[in-house]
């Protein structure tokens, strides 16, 4: 078979996505997974899938002088299992009638030869047709099975072949790219901070501990202190895309034990409102570019999970913490001016702001001192901080603030939070030698995507999610 295949002259190896009617009559070579196959006795039909694209391939049962497959080859092709990875050489033929069930609807490939590069086991953990069916297709075909999400996660490599999953991680990649691009275009330098630390970065108890050469170390729950030290070191604008670790036994649909942090820190030239405006402009740029560059992926996801286009403005809608408390009190929600918002109150605020301002994203600033970490700049007289959260579709997607840059104030606030200054020695020492005013934010990538699409399960946006119940695969 290999020898005969090599004698079939083709016009190069082609991606399925690049096949179109202009190749009518030309011989090509394509590779992909066997998504579907059927045999009517006289004909074999195979739907070949590569990434998010599919094409129908067909061959006729051979007769003497047919010039196609031999009878042994025809019999062998009929036995190829679903999800096997194969190469097909054949002639592109333009079709007069639309081919349903394929992304390439006006062409098919008439098979002249093939080879199996990797055979798939007959016993698949789930049928790809079941996880590839859109909401509309499910309504029309009630025989399609619902595959439990934990089974999909247990077999994540195969699940990544599903169109919705593939499109999701294409969009996730786009968000990281646009985040990095915007910051680099605005003078930011990328840094990589240590994820092995000697003590808590924020005084919390939710840390993973590891053995580190006969002593205890911890997995970083934030790059916060290192970002600030980079600014103190003279790098005016820095950012990081890196993993963050939180040992929280919380709702696995909302929190991950390991997630990707999009962090940035910058010097402040005027006041902290400049940082708020900059972050909002960055998010607007990301949202604009997603619509412009990832329209196909967004529509693929929409076919499986309906979501509304995001509503936002060029300039941010900014409300103070006190103003937001007043809005909630008017809605009958009981809370005080010193209280932080929980997930329910954030959701309520999201609907109120959408009704009042017609946007899905807004900023809450000036949180009470009691609700923020020790490194947050304070206005002691007013009892508030120069801090801010961004709320997207009723969910917090980032938290940030102007930071404390005066050494004696920082030591005082550390002690007030019940943290020993000696445990933060390297961080605190750096502020002894002068520090510019600075601020920034930390964005949870998976949380941002969850809010953007309005989905209920954050694990959908982690390639191999880690939560209190999952350490596999």
Curated annotation (Swiss-Prot):
Q: Pfam families under this entry?
A: tRNA-synt_2 (PF00152), tRNA_anti-codon (PF01336)
The UniProt annotation places ATP binding at: 246-248, 254-256, 396, 444-447
Main location class = cytoplasm
Domain of life of the organism encoding this protein: Eukaryota
Q: What is its EC number?
A: 6.1.1.12
Instruction: Mention one GO molecular function.
Output: RNA binding
Q: Which reaction does it catalyse?
A: tRNA(Asp) + L-aspartate + ATP = L-aspartyl-tRNA(Asp) + AMP + diphosphate
Query: What Gene3D superfamilies does this protein map onto?
Result: Bira Bifunctional Protein, Domain 2 (3.30.930.10), Nucleic acid-binding proteins (2.40.50.140)
Q: Which GO terms describe its biological process?
A: aspartyl-tRNA aminoacylation
Could you list this entry's UniProt keywords, alphabetically sorted. Aminoacyl-tRNA synthetase, ATP-binding, Cytoplasm, Ligase, Nucleotide-binding, Protein biosynthesis
SUPFAM superfamilies assigned to the protein according to its UniProt record, in alphabetical order: Class II aaRS and biotin synthetases, Nucleic acid-binding proteins
InterPro entries from the xrefs?
Aa-tRNA-synt_II (IPR004364), aa-tRNA-synth_II (IPR006195), aa-tRNA-synth_II/BPL/LPL (IPR045864), Asp-tRNA_synthase_2 (IPR004523), Asp/Asn-tRNA-synth_IIb (IPR002312), NA-bd_OB-fold (IPR012340), NA-bd_OB_tRNA (IPR004365)
Q: Ligase as a keyword?
A: yes
Quaternary structure annotation from Swiss-Prot or TrEMBL: Homodimer.
- Sequence similarity: Belongs to the class-II aminoacyl-tRNA synthetase family. Type 2 subfamily.
Record HAMAP family: Asp_tRNA_synth_type2
Q: Please report the name of this protein according to its UniProt entry.
A: Probable aspartate--tRNA ligase, cytoplasmic
Q: Lineage of the native species?
A: Eukaryota, Fungi, Fungi incertae sedis, Microsporidia, Unikaryonidae
């Amino acid at each position: 078979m290999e020898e005969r295949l090599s004698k079939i002259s083709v016009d190069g190896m082609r991606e399925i996505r690049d096949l179109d009617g202009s190749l009518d009559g030309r011989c090509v070579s394509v590779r992909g997974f066997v998504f579907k196959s059927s045999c009517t006795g006289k004909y074999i039909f195979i739907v070949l899938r590569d990434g998010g694209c599919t094409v129908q391939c067909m061959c006729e049962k051979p007769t003497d002088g047919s010039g196609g497959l031999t009878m042994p080859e025809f019999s062998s092709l009929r036995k190829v299992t679903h999800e096997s990875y194969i190469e097909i050489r054949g002639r592109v033929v333009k079709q007069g009638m639309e081919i349903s069930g394929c992304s390439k609807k006006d062409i098919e490939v008439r098979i002249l030869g093939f080879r199996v590069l990797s055979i798939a086991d007959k016993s698949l953990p789930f049928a790809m047709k079941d996880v590839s069916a859109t909401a509309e297709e499910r309504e029309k075909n009630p025989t399609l099975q619902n595959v439990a999400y934990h089974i999909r996660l247990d077999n994540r490599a195969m699940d990544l072949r599903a169109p919705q999953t593939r499109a999701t991680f294409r969009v996730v990649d786009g968000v990281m790219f646009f985040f990095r691009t915007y910051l680099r275009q605005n003078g930011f330098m990328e840094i990589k901070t240590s994820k092995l630390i000697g003590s808590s970065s924020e005084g919390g108890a939710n840390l993973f501990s590891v053995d580190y050469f006969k002593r205890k170390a911890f997995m970083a729950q934030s790059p916060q202190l290192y970002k600030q030290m980079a600014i103190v070191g003279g790098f005016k604008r820095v950012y990081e895309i890196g993993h963050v670790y939180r040992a929280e036994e919380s709702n696995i649909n909302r929190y991950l034990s390991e997630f990707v942090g999009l962090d940035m820190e910058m010097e402040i030239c005027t006041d902290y409102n400049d940082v708020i405006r900059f972050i909002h402009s960055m998010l607007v740029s990301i949202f604009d570019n997603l619509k412009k560059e990832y329209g196909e992926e967004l529509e693929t996801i929409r076919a499986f999970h309906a979501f509304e286009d995001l509503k936002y403005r060029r300039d941010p809608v900014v409300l103070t913490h006190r103003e937001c408390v007043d809005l909630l009190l008017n809605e009958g929600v009981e809370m005080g001016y010193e209280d932080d918002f929980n997930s329910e109150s954030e959701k309520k605020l999201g609907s109120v702001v959408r009704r009042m301002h017609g946007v899905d994203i807004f900023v809450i600033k000036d949180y009470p001192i009691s609700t923020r970490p020790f490194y947050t700049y304070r206005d002691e007289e007013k009892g508030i901080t120069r801090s801010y959260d961004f709320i997207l579709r009723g969910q917090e997607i980032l938290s940030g603030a102007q930071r404390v840059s005066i050494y004696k104030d920082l030591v005082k606030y550390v002690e007030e939070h019940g943290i020993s200054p000696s445990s933060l020695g390297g961080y605190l020492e750096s502020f002894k030698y002068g520090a510019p005013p600075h601020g920034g934010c930390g964005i949870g990538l998976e949380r941002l995507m969850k809010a953007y699409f309005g989905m209920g399960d954050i694990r959908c946006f982690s390639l191999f999610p880690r939560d209190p119940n999952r350490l596999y695969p």
